[in-house]
């Protein structure tokens, strides 16, 4: 299956191993890389290789130690520039060669965010982190930047000696750099084959604390205590995940808590999950982000979508496993409650994109579509809804878990397509083919909008949320006195999130209602980011001008796209806030992550910088 998001030709050759030497330079904001690729030919008379690059300067290419000619092709607006290497001799099928490439990144590499010391918690040292998913590894090193190709890697990273480097691999020691006493070299090895999007690097003033037999938490020292508290249950989650999905093959499961500009909730980099500090709620209520990233150790990292059009295979299964872990930790009613909340998230995404937008297909066509622009909760929640629906159809949670375990065993260390997944589903449930044949596969997979069927949910925990939400929707001015702090005193933070999510799917409330809500529930002071985000959106939609500064503060003080993009969009759509919103973005854009900055600029109809 051709990957529309890559120039590389995985049907002609595969990278089997990578040896990286990286030199991180904070002054020039560049990484100089010497990349050694072990390449295996998949055909006879292979005379050239095409690799993905983006904003890279290629200094030199050698094949088996001999200089090789190379040329950069035409640059594509978001795919980057193909690098064509002419081999000094043609390869036969199965033959391997070592391709060495010296390159330097651009300061505007889309995979890297360089933070100056003022943007860190410690305010003393600069900081660098990478985010390669989906198609940004090519802006660090030349590679086959497609999830269909997996390889092992070894790496040596040179950094200023007062800083520490970590990668998505096991640590393999450190040493002083011989040629420069001000620098240090950190070494890493990843012996499990991974796709390029799982290469990850962080460099900063990091400290670590062991919180379990295979988990160390890494962060700046200022965030270490709250992080250690928040993620104390990591080993318990790992054990539940192993019970559900099979043995954990990666050895170490460390967590890195990043500065606030990190664009995602978490990133499942092997051996070292990257986590947003916005989940530091102080009460462990948002730790399910960790259950999600742990689950990726099986669905995503071990069994990988072959192209980004099949992204739901990574995310739908991972959300399914995450909610099974939630069920083990907090009970089946909670799993069902989270599943229902996911359906509302899906409705939100469909409303944002539009119900006829082809990007709301479970399996979208990404030909000439930037994967970052296509990102939404659709692959997560439509994918989960399909699996949850199949669980109910095929005999319940335990029976469906048997399928999931077998699927992971069958496709471990490989990349997989939706067709292969479906074929395996049919072969596993061969005695239930008549049931499977009744599923509207076209409606689920290749049709935009909401799914053709809604699964059934246990409503025990949701009913109180629906009742309170509807009370606010139906309330007239004279009813507002009937609300009090008692309304929410028995609700968990998850239920309060759900009340606000229900209200966000309704018509905007009058300003009088949100003002009263603030009087009785004091939501402006809530620190939980998921509650705060929905509350501020509700107020902006109601047209309450007092919250404009609070919403702008949340949009700029952290950079998690799940929060930043909708807040900026809602503020832009609020006439009275528009000018201030655009000015705030223009003032802050140089401090933003490159992908976040590009997408928010698009949301605000501002041209790229």
Curated annotation (Swiss-Prot):
Pfam family of the protein (one): Peptidase_M1
Miscellaneous: In Xenopus laevis, as well as in lower vertebrates species such as fish and insects, tyrosine at position 375 is a phenylalanine, which reduces the sensitivity of X.laevis LTA4H to suicide inactivation.
Purpose of the protein: Bifunctional zinc metalloenzyme that comprises both epoxide hydrolase (EH) and aminopeptidase activities. Acts as an epoxide hydrolase to catalyze the conversion of leukotriene A4 (LTA4) to the pro-inflammatory mediator leukotriene B4 (LTB4). During the conversion of LTA4 to LTB4, a second product is formed, the isomeric delta6-trans-delta8-cis-LTB4 (5S,12R-dihydroxy-6,10-trans-8,14-cis-eicosatetraenoic acid), with a relative formation of 10% delta6-trans-delta8-cis-LTB4 compared to 90% LTB4.
Pathways involved: Lipid metabolism; leukotriene B4 biosynthesis
GO molecular function: aminopeptidase activity; epoxide hydrolase activity; leukotriene-A4 hydrolase activity; metallopeptidase activity; zinc ion binding
Cofactor: Zn(2+)
Tissue expression notes: Expressed in oocytes.
Cofactor, how bound (note): Binds 1 zinc ion per subunit.
Lineage top rank: taxon: Eukaryota
This protein's name: Leukotriene A-4 hydrolase
Activity regulation: The epoxide hydrolase activity is mildly restrained by suicide inactivation, possibly involving binding of LTA4 to Tyr-380.
Subcellular location per the Swiss-Prot or TrEMBL entry: Cytoplasm
The entry's keywords: Cytoplasm, Hydrolase, Leukotriene biosynthesis, Metal-binding, Metalloprotease, Protease, Zinc
Swiss-Prot/TrEMBL site (Essential for epoxide hydrolase activity, but not for aminopeptidase activity) positions: 372
pH dependence statement: Optimum pH is 8.5 at room temperature (with LTA4 as substrate). Optimum pH is 7.5 at room temperature (with alanine-4-nitroanilide as substrate).
């Amino acid at each position: 299956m051709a990957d529309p998001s890559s120039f590389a030709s995985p049907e002609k050759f595969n990278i089997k191993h990578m040896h990286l030497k990286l030199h991180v330079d904070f002054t020039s904001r560049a990484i100089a890389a010497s990349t050694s690729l072990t390449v295996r030919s998949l055909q006879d008379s292979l005379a050239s290789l095409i690799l993905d690059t983006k904003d890279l300067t290629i200094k030199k290419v050698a094949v088996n130690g001999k200089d090789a000619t190379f040329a950069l092709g035409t640059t594509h607006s978001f795919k980057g520039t193909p690098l064509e290497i002419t081999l000094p001799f043609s390869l036969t099928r199965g033959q391997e060669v070592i391709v060495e490439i010296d390159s330097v990144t651009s300061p505007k590499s889309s995979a890297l965010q360089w933070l100056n010391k003022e943007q860190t918690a410690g305010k003393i040292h600069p900081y660098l982190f990478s985010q390669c998913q989906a198609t940004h590894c090519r802006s660090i090193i030349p590679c086959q930047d497609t999830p269909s190709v997996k390889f092992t890697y070894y790496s040596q990273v040179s950094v200023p000696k007062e800083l520490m480097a970590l990668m998505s691999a096991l640590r393999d020691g450190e040493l002083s750099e011989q040629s420069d006493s001000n620098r240090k070299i950190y070494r890493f090895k990843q012996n499990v084959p991974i796709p390029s999007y799982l290469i990850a690097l962080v460099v900063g003033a990091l400290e670590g604390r062991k919180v379990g037999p295979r988990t160390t938490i890494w962060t700046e020292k200022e965030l270490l205590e709250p992080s250690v508290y928040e993620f104390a249950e990591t080993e318990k989650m790992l054990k539940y995940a192993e019970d559900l999905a099979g043995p954990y093959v990666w050895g170490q499961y460390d967590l890195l808590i990043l500065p606030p500009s990190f664009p995602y909730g978490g990133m499942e980099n092997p051996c070292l999950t990257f986590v947003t500090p916005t989940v530091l709620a102080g009460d462990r209520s948002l730790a399910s982000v960790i259950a999600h990233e742990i689950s990726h150790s099986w669905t995503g990292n071990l069994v990988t979508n072959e192209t980004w059009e099949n992204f739901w295979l990574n995310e739908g299964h991972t959300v399914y496993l995450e909610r099974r872990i939630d069920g083990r930790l907090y009970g089946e009613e909670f799993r069902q409650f989270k599943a229902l909340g996911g359906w509302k998230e899906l409705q939100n995404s469909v409303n944002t994109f539009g119900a006829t937008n082809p990007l709301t297909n479970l399996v979208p066509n990404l030909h000439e579509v930037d994967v970052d622009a296509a990102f939404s909760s659709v692959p997560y929640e439509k994918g989960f809804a399909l699996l949850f629906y199949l669980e109910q159809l095929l005999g319940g949670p335990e029976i469906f878990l048997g399928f999931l375990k077998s699927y992971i065993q069958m496709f471990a260390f490989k990349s997989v397509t939706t067709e292969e997944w479906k074929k395996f589903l049919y072969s596993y449930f061969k005695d239930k083919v008549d049931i499977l044949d009744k599923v509207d596969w076209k409606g689920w997979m290749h049709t935009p909008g909401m799914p053709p069927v809604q699964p059934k949910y246990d409503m025990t925990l949701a009913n109180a949320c629906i009742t309170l939400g509807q009370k606010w929707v139906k309330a007239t001015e004279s009813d507002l006195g009937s609300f009090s702090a008692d309304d929410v005193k028995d609700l968990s933070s998850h239920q309060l999130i759900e009340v606000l999510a229900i209200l966000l799917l309704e018509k905007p409330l009058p300003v009088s209602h949100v003002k009263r809500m603030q009087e009785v529930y004091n939501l402006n002071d809530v620190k939980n980011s998921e509650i705060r985000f929905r509350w501020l959106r509700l107020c902006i939609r109601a047209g309450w001008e007092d919250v404009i500064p609070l919403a702008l503060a949340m949009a700029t003080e952290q950079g998690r796209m799940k929060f930043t993009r909708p807040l900026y969009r809602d503020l832009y759509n609020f006439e009275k806030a528009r000018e201030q919103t655009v000015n705030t973005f223009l003032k802050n854009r140089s401090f933003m992550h490159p992908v976040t900055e590009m997408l928010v600029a698009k949301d605000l109809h501002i041209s790229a910088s």
